[in-house]
Amino acid sequence: MIPRTPHRLARAALLLATAALVSGCADPGPKNIPTVSGEFGKRPTVVMPKLPAPKQARMTVLKEGDGPVTRKGQVIVTDVDMRLWESGKPLMDTYRLEQPTTAVLDGKHVARTWDQSLIGRKAGSRVLLVSPATHGFGPNGMAPAQVKPSDHMVLVFDVIGGYDPKQQVSGGSSASGAASAHPAVSVRPGQEPVLSDWGPAPKKFAARTLVAGTGPELKPGQRMVVQFSGVEWGKKGSFNSTYRRSGPNGFLLKDRALLPGWYEGLTGRRVGSRVLLTVPAGHRPGFTHTDGGLAAPKNRPVAYVVDILDAR
């Protein structure tokens, strides 16, 4: 046993005191970061500190999800609350619109800060981004006219998931046609569905499962992710289609947040299903568009082919 001399005891005491001093002076982390509260999928409460905004973009994962990791080249379906640091003025709020946004992470469509914040995140994650306005928008970092270059933005993302732009349900064609109440549906891998052999326009709403999925059932209030094509009855070509835009889109499963026929036709369907919705003219009297901007031909019968890819 080594004897504890006064010299050794003094040195030990000095080391302990130094350790305590270092611990007490350790950097607790940046203080100029907003406080964010609230649960995933609900509009967050954001409180800004009374401090200048950080000069550089800063990203923080507030909650790590448990779903698949997002990848570059995918489209990311996410809710987002975006506001100005300086005034708290809201710039974008998908929670109020009741429709998530879709970000194409290919280095061209959104700002680099979005790529850095959303690539490599697990579905179900909540992410905070604080960024100078000139780096917070895309493409090319262009901010809207009402935002000054000296402003800073605060964004809270609730990441629903990442999806391949042409992702769709596995399954072939449906051999309906004029003899039935449904058009024939032909689907080739990675391509928009083609509807043909139209019969008489529907007088009643109907939903038909073309491919039965095996995933969880859709429940009211969930965010669902779909590929879809909408076609006016008897016409060629779609009036609205995710295949012709960015790819999979997210929607809140709530009656007034969806196109006529979607809520009753998709609630209870399983993820992995392909569903044909035939909607008569005037199915929801007075409908013009959703708060998220979804619209359909007024007083016209339509058909939708909807691939249910995910739900959260």
Model-assigned labels for residue ranges:
Residues I2-R312:
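Cross-family detector of peptidyl-prolyl cis-trans isomerase
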